[in-house]
Amino acid sequence: MDRTRKQCSVLAFTDDAVLPVSTIVNAVRELGNEGAEQCDPQVVTQASSLSKLPVDSSSMDIVISICRSLQFQGDFLFEEISRVLKPGGTVLIYKTLQSVAEGTSEAVLALERKLLLAGFLEAQGLQLNSLELSGLDHSFGMKAKKPSWKIGSSFALKKSTKGSVKVNLDDDLIDEDSLLTEEDMKKPPIAPGGDCEVGSTRKACKNCTCGRAEAEEKVKLGPTMEQLNNPQSACGSCGLGDAFRCSTCPYKGLPPFKLGEKVSLSGNFLAADI
């Protein structure tokens, strides 16, 4: 593991014509890399005239950018930094106050936002008070990491297996008889025949259920023997025939007759004509 740290690949670029190696070593040491003095960094100067870094893709563990002048923004190189860094690699960016037009806090927020938009993770500011970087007085810095995955990489997602819940349908059924009480189980008493009101004259009640009302209705349909032997009429129209009789007339259906005379029926009155 220590050997890997000693052999870490470092790329540093700046807009100056000269960049001391000691500045790069001190910057790498701040990352906690042991044996930073033994690293062999690649240095690119006057990078403001470049549109592409002259290194292979995914070949660097650390990339350091040092910006001193306002003319060299270096923002167009963020994509190049992401290209040359290995997955999980680190980028360090240092800017002097002369290289920014706004204040320090605004410049730090703008730089952090640009790093996040370029795809870097864990962007955070650096405390330069403890750094001994030559020529970087009155400056601010920030570091970030490239994601550990490669662009275009894919992996299979594990589908969560849903366990089937066993449901016993019999447990959901309720015996209806268990909901009934002893009073509910008793059969209702059956009303005896002729249960209408008992009085001086037995007659069907209003809500008759014993059949007395039907029997009384049948009696009312035809004239009694007393009415046949001694016909009488309260309206005076019973003997004129059905055309003059009311709907409840007991003589309805009988031939016309004279009141006070005995009504006699022929022997074949109920016999069929055919």
Swiss-Prot record:
<dbReference type="GO" id="GO:0005758">
    <property type="term" value="C:mitochondrial intermembrane space"/>
</dbReference>
<keyword id="KW-0411">Iron-sulfur</keyword>
<dbReference type="InterPro" id="IPR046408">
    <property type="entry name" value="CIAPIN1"/>
</dbReference>
<feature type="binding site">
    <location>
        <position position="235"/>
    </location>
    <ligand>
        <name>[4Fe-4S] cluster</name>
    </ligand>
</feature>
<comment type="similarity">
    <text>Belongs to the anamorsin family.</text>
</comment>
<dbReference type="InterPro" id="IPR007785">
    <property type="entry name" value="Anamorsin"/>
</dbReference>
<feature type="region of interest" description="Fe-S binding site A">
    <location>
        <begin position="196"/>
        <end position="210"/>
    </location>
</feature>
<feature type="binding site">
    <location>
        <position position="246"/>
    </location>
    <ligand>
        <name>[4Fe-4S] cluster</name>
    </ligand>
</feature>
<dbReference type="GO" id="GO:0051537">
    <property type="term" value="F:2 iron, 2 sulfur cluster binding"/>
</dbReference>
<dbReference type="GO" id="GO:0051539">
    <property type="term" value="F:4 iron, 4 sulfur cluster binding"/>
</dbReference>
<keyword id="KW-0496">Mitochondrion</keyword>
<dbReference type="GO" id="GO:0005737">
    <property type="term" value="C:cytoplasm"/>
</dbReference>
<keyword id="KW-0479">Metal-binding</keyword>
<feature type="binding site">
    <location>
        <position position="208"/>
    </location>
    <ligand>
        <name>[2Fe-2S] cluster</name>
    </ligand>
</feature>
<dbReference type="Pfam" id="PF20922">
    <property type="entry name" value="Anamorsin_N"/>
</dbReference>
<keyword id="KW-0963">Cytoplasm</keyword>
<feature type="binding site">
    <location>
        <position position="196"/>
    </location>
    <ligand>
        <name>[2Fe-2S] cluster</name>
    </ligand>
</feature>
<feature type="region of interest" description="Linker">
    <location>
        <begin position="154"/>
        <end position="185"/>
    </location>
</feature>
<feature type="binding site">
    <location>
        <position position="238"/>
    </location>
    <ligand>
        <name>[4Fe-4S] cluster</name>
    </ligand>
</feature>
<comment type="subunit">
    <text>Monomer.</text>
</comment>
<feature type="binding site">
    <location>
        <position position="249"/>
    </location>
    <ligand>
        <name>[4Fe-4S] cluster</name>
    </ligand>
</feature>
<feature type="region of interest" description="N-terminal SAM-like domain">
    <location>
        <begin position="1"/>
        <end position="154"/>
    </location>
</feature>
<feature type="short sequence motif" description="Cx2C motif 2">
    <location>
        <begin position="246"/>
        <end position="249"/>
    </location>
</feature>
<comment type="function">
    <text>Component of the cytosolic iron-sulfur (Fe-S) protein assembly (CIA) machinery. Required for the maturation of extramitochondrial Fe-S proteins. Part of an electron transfer chain functioning in an early step of cytosolic Fe-S biogenesis, facilitating the de novo assembly of a [4Fe-4S] cluster on the cytosolic Fe-S scaffold complex. Electrons are transferred from NADPH via a FAD- and FMN-containing diflavin oxidoreductase.</text>
</comment>
<feature type="short sequence motif" description="Cx2C motif 1">
    <location>
        <begin position="235"/>
        <end position="238"/>
    </location>
</feature>
<dbReference type="GO" id="GO:0009055">
    <property type="term" value="F:electron transfer activity"/>
</dbReference>
<feature type="binding site">
    <location>
        <position position="210"/>
    </location>
    <ligand>
        <name>[2Fe-2S] cluster</name>
    </ligand>
</feature>
<keyword id="KW-0004">4Fe-4S</keyword>
<dbReference type="GO" id="GO:0016226">
    <property type="term" value="P:iron-sulfur cluster assembly"/>
</dbReference>
<dbReference type="GO" id="GO:0046872">
    <property type="term" value="F:metal ion binding"/>
</dbReference>
<keyword id="KW-0408">Iron</keyword>
<keyword id="KW-0001">2Fe-2S</keyword>
<dbReference type="InterPro" id="IPR049011">
    <property type="entry name" value="Anamorsin_N_metazoan"/>
</dbReference>
<dbReference type="Pfam" id="PF05093">
    <property type="entry name" value="CIAPIN1"/>
</dbReference>
<feature type="region of interest" description="Fe-S binding site B">
    <location>
        <begin position="235"/>
        <end position="249"/>
    </location>
</feature>
<feature type="binding site">
    <location>
        <position position="205"/>
    </location>
    <ligand>
        <name>[2Fe-2S] cluster</name>
    </ligand>
</feature>
<protein>
    <recommendedName>
        <fullName>Anamorsin homolog</fullName>
    </recommendedName>
</protein>
<dbReference type="InterPro" id="IPR029063">
    <property type="entry name" value="SAM-dependent_MTases_sf"/>
</dbReference>
